[in-house]
């Protein structure tokens, strides 16, 4: 695992992440396999990013009648997939935190200016919560920053961004906008093409996830 502490970003180096990334990059990977790989990478990034979570402690009674002190997941986690591609991560992450509220923000990009436009937003209370923003493709950083600005205004306890791929400019923009955000990525790519797509990238993650 490599960490770029200057940008608060961690590149998660794991054989399963690398193999899934190979599938995601391959233009011949069919929809179902793409969705499975995206969910798998989301789960592995969440695994790494949640290491620092503060566990709650409680007591349970075992089938043998003994009382045991046990750890319990905190009820502070909020998952925030950015539509559409973030839904691909949600599938992999939600089984680990089934009761966590799911906030949703829908953002489209103007294809000429590449500026983000929010067309949908449902945010539960975020103050004091550990918010995980799911944005598989961190390209210009415009969409992520539009969300991060809204979330940080609600004063969460922590802010984490999970992405399969990040362009260096996207990482820098996120760090400039919300430097407290911890970023976990499968890989940092070379840059962006003229349409704002990540290079070498994996294409349009939302289209490939949903078969559109
Ligand atoms: N969104 C995508 O789906 N792919 C990119 O390369 C950039 C943004």
Segments and roles (model prediction):
Residues 1-212:
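PRPP-associated nucleotide enzymes
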């Amino acid at each position: 695992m490599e960490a770029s502490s200057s940008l608060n970003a961690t590149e998660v180096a794991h054989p399963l992440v690398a193999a899934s990334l190979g599938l995601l990059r391959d233009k011949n990977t069919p929809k179902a396999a793409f969705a499975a790989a995206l969910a798998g990478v989301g789960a592995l990034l969440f695994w790494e990013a949640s290491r620092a979570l503060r566990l709650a402690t409680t007591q349970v009674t075992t089938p043998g009648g003994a009382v045991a002190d046990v750890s319990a997941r905190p009820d502070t986690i909020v998952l925030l997939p950015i539509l559409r591609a973030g839904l691909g991560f949600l599938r992999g992450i939600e089984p680990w935190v089934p009761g966590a509220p799911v906030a949703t923000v829908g953002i489209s990009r103007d294809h000429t200016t590449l500026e983000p436009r929010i067309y949908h937003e449902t945010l539960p209370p975020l103050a004091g919560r550990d918010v995980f923003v799911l944005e598989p493709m961190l390209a210009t950083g415009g969409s992520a920053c539009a969300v991060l600005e809204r979330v940080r205004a609600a004063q969460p306890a922590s802010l984490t961004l999970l992405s399969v791929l990040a362009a260096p400019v996207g990482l820098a923009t996120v760090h400039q906008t919300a430097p407290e955000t911890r970023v976990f990525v499968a890989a940092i790519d070379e840059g962006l093409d003229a349409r704002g797509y990540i290079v070498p990238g994996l294409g349009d993650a939302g289209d490939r996830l949903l078969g559109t």
